[in-house]
Amino acid sequence: MHASLQLGYTNEISAEYLSHMDDCYFKEQQPSSFIDEKRAYVKAHPPIAIYRVATEGSQTRDGGVVQQGTLRMVFTLDSGQQVCAARKGDLVVYADGRTAQIVTTAGEANSHIALVGSRLGNGDEIINTPQEGFLLFTREGVPMAEDFLPALTLAEVQLPSSDVTMEGVR
């Protein structure tokens, strides 16, 4: 497990942060008709939520840690440490040695990259990530892909025993 305690970033953000998500899209060198078209889209579909990318060192609600991200996307943390993005199938390790696989992600169109909010095969969920900068976001009125963080089905959850029910599973 990682020896140093990293600051974990969640998907919790302020309304002000969301309101500035599109600021970088409007460059003066772009044609004004293009800018007007983008502004109309942004006004009609403002950002409503973010999903940070999970990496090595991301933590779960039940105390697990992503040990090795296998997606070839590398982030340099504030500490200078480099971590890889996690994806579907990567393992989360718990202090007692148990492991669980990441089973829900941003979907095929996003290379099955794991996110804060991704679920594991044991019903656990990734709750934070040590990287701050790379995220996906949703817009009002714009549906996400069907395979973007889908709800788990009972068949996808590895139950510890037959008499246990999992919260949040349909």
Say what each PLM segment does.
Residues 1-170:
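Intrinsically disordered, low-complexity proline/glycine-rich segments
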